[in-house]
From Swiss-Prot:
Ranges where the Sigma-54 factor interaction domain occurs: 188-417
Known DNA-binding region: 483-502
NCBIfam families to which the protein is assigned, alphabetical: PRK05022.1 (NF003451)
Pathway: Nitrogen metabolism; nitric oxide reduction
InterPro entries: AAA+_ATPase, GAF, GAF-like_dom_sf, Homeodomain-like_sf, NorR, P-loop_NTPase, Sigma_54_int, Sigma_54_int_dom_ATP-bd_1
Keywords, sorted A to Z: ATP-binding, DNA-binding, Nucleotide-binding, Phosphoprotein, Transcription, Transcription regulation
Organism the protein comes from: Serratia proteamaculans (strain 568)
Name recorded for this polypeptide: Anaerobic nitric oxide reductase transcription regulator NorR
One term of GO molecular function: DNA binding
């Protein structure tokens, strides 16, 4: 037996040390990599037909953000279906999910791999994977020894999952124990301290019945926060209804919110329920709530206060039971002071405010997010491998990301498409040249991109119009074609922006 009692005892000790579960898992992985003398090790959690890395050693940092779906990774599927130790021969035809993800060996294939499924009774809860560039590295370890390691890790992971479930129930006692199954791509990615704090606050407020105001810049992921709150609440089995207030023309906004009866106005050919009725006993997400008119804010306040609403054209009162989650990228408190937003409505909504940090304040999460989007992009484009070079990741971490996570996602996809056209291969590595971003301030990039390649013989007036049109177009895309948000970002009056757009033949 190659593994000594002392070695196994040291593993058990590592599982009891550390201040947090994350720290314990990292210590475990570090110890196992040293013990087995391999090049890479990983502890994965199994949920929703995919593996999620909890701790890694010897792998690129962006692996922590990747989600390995079974149907896209045959090696991991083989581990999930196995009842014990899985050894992959060095010449295995099954692609290794970590190919190209061992730093310093970007172009070198992983040679030897073993996988240990982790079970709690009969349920698969995770896996351990070990990889080595030496094809013979794992031959000296018996299956019995590896099963002992598996048993220790499975017990630790199962205990962690039980503690997590108990903590979640303690923080949200009104939430249903099982909760609802998250939709694909609903996960909030991030291990930075600000994101850990945000996740903690979400867990606290989710099981309550409080209305929540979620603030943050465009593209930070406010809708993901909304979904996390809804899924962690007692209303999770009931509807989550979405309404973008900024996209509502004033003439139809009241009908969209409260519904209407047949004949209430021209075109009302039948009765129609509004968003409040659709969300009865569930949750209503009011995105960009700061764009509602003051008159509609007054009617919204009444429904929030008393649960009473009237369809347009109807004298009858309906009662609804709806939880409000509102989001905005505006400073509503200042808007209330300025008279642009009702102060009483602001206080009703902001009982438990949540602020989602911009990406520039969580730089340590960029690698995880980049890995997450690389894996999704790899699957969508049908690639065998999609990795980031060290230089590319460094460039991503130095950029200010004014469009936040949404801009990062679009940049990854655009870079992958450029790389595929250039390399004509199913195994791609993204380089700095594949990204159109530049480290530092945004204005320089905008100026470079907005002006034509040659300005010789072009009048200053024409150049000015070209520049204005380009900047407005780029900002519109960043703001998801939201003119009101675009005006705020460009620090323009909304009416002036619309007039300028018409003058530039953009409307």
């Amino acid at each position: 037996m190659t593994l000594s009692i002392q070695s196994l005892a040291s593993i058990a000790i590592e599982l009891q040390s550390g201040l947090t579960q994350r720290d314990r898992f990292q210590r475990l992985i570090n110890s196992l990599r040293s013990l087995l003398r391999c090049d890479a090790s990983a502890l994965l959690r199994f949920e929703g037909q995919q593996f999620r890395p909890l701790a890694i050693d010897g792998l690129a940092q962006d692996v922590l953000g990747r989600r390995f779906a079974l149907d896209a990774h045959p090696r991991l599927e083989a581990i999930a279906r196995a009842g014990g130790v899985v050894r992959f021969p060095a010449d295995s035809e099954l692609p290794d999910p970590y190919d190209g993800l061992i730093p310093g060996h970007d172009q070198l294939k992983v040679h030897a791999c073993i996988g240990l499924p982790l079970f709690a009774e009969q349920d698969l809860i995770g896996a351990l994977t070990f990889d080595s560039l030496d094809p013979m590295q794992f031959d000296r370890f018996s299956d019995e020894e590896l099963r002992l390691i598996s048993a220790l890790a499975a017990g630790a992971l199962n205990n962690a999952l039980l503690v997590e479930a108990l903590e979640r129930q303690a923080l949200s006692p009104l939430a249903s124990p099982g909760g609802s199954s998250p939709r694909e791509n609903d996960e909030i990615i991030g291990l930075s301290s600000v994101m850990q704090q945000l996740k903690q606050e979400i867990s606290i407020v989710a099981g309550s019945e409080l209305n929540v105001l979620i603030t943050g810049e465009t593209g930070v992921g406010k809708e993901l926060v909304v979904r996390a709150i809804h899924q962690g609440s007692a209303r999770a089995a009931n509807p989550l209804v979405y309404l973008n207030c900024a996209a509502l023309p004033e003439s139809v906004a009241e009908s969209e919110l409260f519904g209407h009866v047949k004949g209430a106005f021209t075109g009302a050919i039948q009765h129609r329920a509004g968003k409040f009725e659709m969300a009865d006993n569930g949750t209503l997400f009011l995105d960009e709530i700061g764009e509602l008119s003051l008159s509609l804010q007054a009617k919204l306040l009444r429904v929030i206060q008393y649960g009473d609403l009237q369809r347009v054209g109807d004298d009858r009162v309906k009662r609804v039971n709806v939880r409000i989650l509102a989001a905005t990228n505006r400073d509503l408190k200042q808007a209330a002071v300025d008279g642009a937003f009702r102060l009483d409505l602001y206080h009703r909504l902001s009982v438990f405010p949540l602020a989602v940090p911009p990406l520039r304040e969580r730089v340590s999460d960029i690698a995880l997010l980049a890995g997450y989007f690389c894996e999704r992009c790899r699957i969508k484009l049908g690639l065998m491998q999609l990795t980031l070079s060290v230089q590319a990741l460094s460039a991503l971490e130095q950029y200010s990301w004014p469009g936040n996570i949404r801009e990062l996602e679009h940049s990854i996809y655009r870079a992958a498409i450029l790389a595929r056209a250039e390399q004509s291969s199913s195994e791609l590595q993204l380089l700095p040249a594949h990204f159109t971003i530049k480290a530092g301030a945004l204005p320089a990039r905008i100026i470079d991109d907005a002006l034509p390649e040659s300005a010789i013989g072009v009048s200053l007036a024409t150049l000015t119009q070209h520049f204005q049109r380009s900047v407005i177009e780029k900002t519109l895309v960043e703001c998801e074609m939201n003119w009101a948000a675009t005006a705020r970002k460009l620090e323009l009056d909304s009416g002036n922006l619309h007039r300028l757009a018409k003058r530039l033949n953009m409307k």
